[in-house]
Design a protein with these regions (language model features):
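Compositionally biased terminal segments of proteins
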Residues: 1-231
Length: 231
């Protein structure tokens, strides 16, 4: 089974477990959603495998987090006491990370999570199951922000950069998606992409995504430049 089909199965499993009362209050995000935002069939087949599902949760404060944990336990999620990731719960053998919009809840967040929740789109995962999905422009912004926090300046080895480049490779409308975003978001994406373009390792990361296909490599760079020069 391809990585994208495995990921869809993972997303469906989590969505079904959450049930109608929780599913619409959470936004699916992260590497497991990359394939849902890609429109190019070739790129879909190149999507990396990831072993966890990420969701943004609209909660404020630690007390709200503990309340959510109790609700999730009823749904079949459990706490793995051996896990170092504070936001992680386990559904059978599947890792599921619930990431709050408020830093006070668990001591971390992503500056774009709150807006990502406010702008999330409905996505029909199956004929009978609809989830809230991060929009492409906020996917890009959250990945850039995540790379700043954990990428250690290594664009070539970063899964965040890999996911980001798969979007630029495989989503034909990504330049228009970002062009229609708020000025703050456009400027942030532009500034971060400029920094990446100045990193010598970034070119190698693009080459890896393009599978050394010169035409695909050129397309990726053209789309990135289109988002940098958005005015």
């Amino acid at each position: 089974m391809s990585a994208i089909n495995l990921q869809k199965n993972m997303l469906e499993k989590v969505a079904v477990a959450l049930g109608d009362d929780l599913i619409q209050s959470m936004v699916f995000v992260g590497g497991c959603t990359t394939g849902l935002l890609v429109t190019d069939e070739f790129t879909k087949e190149q999507i990396r495998y990831t072993d966890d599902v990420d969701l943004i949760v609209d909660i404020i404060g630690y007390a709200a987090w503990t309340d959510l944990q109790e609700q999730l336990k009823v749904k079949g999620f459990s706490i793995d006491m051996g896990e170092e990731v504070m936001c992680r719960m386990i559904l059978d053998n599947l890792k599921v990370d619930f990431m709050p919009i408020d830093e006070q809840a668990l001591g971390f967040t992503n500056i774009w999570y709150k807006d990502a929740v406010a702008t999330a789109q409905d996505y029909a995962l199956t004929d009978t199951l609809t989830i809230k999905l991060i929009t492409p422009e906020y996917f890009v912004a959250t990945k850039l922000e995540a790379y700043l926090g954990r990428g250690k300046g290594d664009a070539l080895s970063s899964h965040d950069i890999e996911d980001l480049l798969n979007i630029f490779d495989g989503r034909a409308s990504i330049v228009d998606d970002i062009a229609s975003a708020s000025e703050d978001l456009r400027n942030y994406i532009s500034d971060q992409l400029k920094s990446l373009m100045a990193d010598g390792n970034f070119e190698y990361a693009v080459q890896a995504t393009a599978r050394n296909d010169a035409d695909r490599e050129q397309l990726i760079f053209e789309r990135i430049e289109g988002c940098i020069n958005h005015d």
